[in-house]
Structures are given as C-alpha cells and as structure tokens.
Amino acid sequence: MDYSYDEDLDELCPVCGDKVSGYHYGLLTCESCKGFFKRTVQNNKHYTCTESQSCKIDKTQRKRCPFCRFQKCLTVGMRLEAVRADRMRGGRNKFGPMYKRDRALKQQKKAQIRANGFKLETGPPMGVAPPPPPPPDYMLPPGLHAPEPKGLAAGPPTGPLGDFGAPTLPMAVPSAHGPLAGYLYPAFPGRAIKSEYPEPYASPPQPGPPYGYPEPFSGGPGVPELIVQLLQLEPDEDQVRARIVGCLQEPAKGRPDQPAPFSLLCRMADQTFISIVDWARRCMVFKELEVADQMTLLQNCWSELLVFDHIYRQIQHGKEGSILLVTGQEVELTTVAAQAGSLLHGLVLRAQELVLQLHALQLDRQEFVCLKFLILFSLDVKFLNNHSLVKDAQEKANAALLDYTLCHYPHCGDKFQQLLLCLVEVRALSMQAKEYLYHKHLGNEMPRNNLLIEMLQAKQT
C-alpha cells in the first residue's frame, strides 16, 4: 500500500533525486525507483556492475547500472520484505505505523520552519553529489608527527616514520595468544584462524585487560534514549589506542625484523577491527542475537565500520593536510602521495572528501554513534535467523537519529537524509577498500594470518 505525503515539503527521492510520489517499500521514493525495486525483487533479478560497484546514481543516470541502483535502494532503507511475492498490486501494509510517525515528524518540521520564520531550503538532490569542496590547503610541512596522546600507559612511537607508517620501534604482529584470539574466540567459538606460528592453540586464549569505558553519558534535552545508551557504550579512545599500540609492540616469535609499512598498517586495521567487535558485542540487540547472526552481521559490515571509524577520527583530527592513525601518529598527505601506490592514495583522498562533507554537515558524536549502529544493523543482510530483531533495531535507530537531528539542527531540515546519503558513500568506499585489499592479497603482499583477508574470504564463501 502506498501512503500520501506532504507535497509542500518538496521531498526528493533518496535513491536518484527525482521528485517523490509517496511512501513505497519503507520510505518516500519516486515512481521510477519504486517500480525498479519491485521488479528486481519479484523477478529475483541478479545484476553485475562493470565498474567498481560505486556508480553515481541520479535522475539522469539511474538506468545505467542496475546493480548500484539496487544496492543504493537497500542502503537508503527500501525493504525487501515489503514487496509482495504474489505479484499482486499494492505493498504489504506492515509499515503503516512507521509512515504515520514519519508524517508526524514532517508536520513537526513544517511547524518549526513556520515558527522560526524561515523558508525550507532543500539540499542537493539525494543521490546527486554535492558541489565539490574547495581544494584542501596542504600547508603542513612534509613528514610525520606523533602527538603524545594523553593518559597512555604506553604511547605511540615518537620517532618519525622512515617509510610511510613504519615506526622506528620494533613493532610486530601480536602473539597468537594475544587480544586477536582473546576478543574473537569468546564471542565466536567456532571461528578458526590459521596461525603462521608453529605452536597450536593448546588451551583457550586468555583475553587481555578489557577496554576502558568513559563515565556514563546522562544525555540531555532532546537526546533520545537509544543514543544515550550508545554513547555509554563508546570505548575510551585513549585506552583503545594504548591497547593497540601495546599489541603492535609485542615481540613476534621468531620474527625480530621490523615489519614493512603496509604490513604494519594491516595489523593496525586488524587491531582496530577487534575493538569494533568488542563494541558490537556490548551493543543492545546485538548481544541478544545468536552467534551465527552476529557473525553474519559483522561479515556484512566490517569494512564499513572500519572506514567510518577512520572517517570520524579525521573529523576529530581536523587537519586537512594529514591523516591521524589509530596509534596517534600523523601522516602527511604529501607522504601518502609520495610513498603509497596510486590505488591507496586515491582511497585516502576519496575518504578525505567525505571527511570534509561530514564536517560541513557538522556531524557530532551523537550522530556518529547512531550511524555506526545503523551500519551494524543493515537490513540488506540475508540468511539471518532473527531478521525481525535486526529490523526493529534499524527502525528505532532511524527514528532516534531523525528525532535528534530535527531537535538539535532545525535549521538543517534535510540533515537526516544527508547523513544517510553519506552512509552510501561509506559503503562505496568500503567496497573499494576491499577490492584493494584483495588485489594486494592476490599479489601476495598481505601479511600472513591477516584477519581482514579472512573476513573477505568468509564473505565470499
């Protein structure tokens, strides 16, 4: 069933930017994307992308790549379960309460606009990239800086990186009995990681000290309870950094040599992912799921969570001429350009563009934790045993984010939609990053026993 909407809000389709015609399969979309989504689901069509699975989808180009168009339909929230399998006209009338809530919030937004006496300014069409930001002013001197993080028991390497990310201290891959095993095995007992070390797992690994968590966030006016809970789950950044640095500094068995720069970056990403797994295990709803569903969700979104973690770190870093590593070290973009390959350099620059875009949107910590939760509970995941629980979590997070943005940013009427559009770019970036990692893997350039490659292979099987 299609639901009407308020035309004076002049909504734009979140998939292609065309004018919406009503509520279709979970949200407001245009007639074209409504029909495309319905045909794809009912006919069980499978598309392929001839490019890099990150094609631009707008009103003029929406028919060029059905694969990317369908992926964007799922990303912005169109619901597979809302399409009738019997091919009869009309959708499943199970989203009526959500539509009514959405209409009520839009009425509230209109009232705020009228009360404040300003005209609703619509942003760029959804699915159409905003104007490119001005070129960053890379005025910092070349090289790398390692600012001393506060409160670290074992700070990051203080010497310069001689070769794009390689510290002067002997950093090595953590022991097979270190946090890698300790954080994954308790949650996923069936997971087997092939070790490059001769010593087998004779006994369950002992986890290291847990990540520290900050004082509970008490919230404030206009902060939904879900966001308050998510803020309380956020780990202390200094504690996470200290743990990762400590793991990287553990001596490797039989490997006293200094690791290569790219290998070191992969190990940083491994340890960052372990901290993300620890966060997910503490999340409401996620900890209620069966282990199989937990693994399915993480296999679907691990790269997006890593990319979004990097993006938010750069927003906090606030320097256009350098990037901040999870260890607290700064790497000049000029160093990346000079020493990284063209593929990695392109990825970094594309990520920096998203950093500028989210900075312009004034992304705050409350929105960050809610978006991270939305990434974890993606609705396009198949073969879940408890799909209804995941769907409920997604709907509550969407509602919380919408409430928060309307309350705290009433002058930015479309901020909620713009934030969701940024998640589309996060996904595109993560897919490009996975392709890069797999390319390095095929060239035997990835370090052995790498968790990221195992996640890639688990997704493909």
From Swiss-Prot:
Biased amino acid composition, Pro residues: 127-139
Presence of keyword Nucleus: yes
Entry keyword Zinc-finger: yes
Superkingdom, natural source: Eukaryota
Region (Disordered), start-end ranges: 119-150
Gene Ontology cellular-component terms listed: cytosol; nucleoplasm; nucleus; RNA polymerase II transcription regulator complex
Zinc finger (NR C4-type): 13-33, 49-73
Region (Important for dimerization): 230-461
UniProt-annotated location(s): Nucleus
Every NR LBD domain range: 222-459
Chief location of this protein within or outside the cell: nucleus
DNA-binding interval(s): 10-85
GO MF terms held by the record: chromatin binding; DNA binding; enzyme binding; nuclear receptor activity; phospholipid binding; RNA polymerase II cis-regulatory region sequence-specific DNA binding; transcription coregulator binding; zinc ion binding
BP terms from Gene Ontology: adrenal gland development; female gonad development; hormone metabolic process; hormone-mediated signaling pathway; Leydig cell differentiation; luteinization; maintenance of protein location in nucleus; male gonad development
PROSITE patterns, A to Z: NR_LBD, NUCLEAR_REC_DBD_1, NUCLEAR_REC_DBD_2
Cross-link annotation Glycyl lysine isopeptide (Lys-Gly) (interchain with G-Cter in SUMO), location: 119, 194
Keywords assigned: Acetylation, Activator, DNA-binding, Isopeptide bond, Lipid-binding, Metal-binding, Nucleus, Phosphoprotein, Receptor, Transcription, Transcription regulation, Ubl conjugation, Zinc, Zinc-finger
Post-translation changes: Acetylation stimulates the transcriptional activity. Sumoylation reduces CDK7-mediated phosphorylation on Ser-203.
Positions of modified residues (N6-acetyllysine): 34, 38, 72
Subunit structure: Binds DNA as a monomer. Part of a complex consisting of SFPQ, NONO and NR5A1. Interacts with NR0B2, NCOA2 and PPARGC1A. Interacts with DGKQ and CDK7. Binds to and activated by HIPK3.
Family in the record: Belongs to the nuclear hormone receptor family. NR5 subfamily.
Protein's recorded name: Steroidogenic factor 1
Species the sequence originates in: Sus scrofa (Pig)
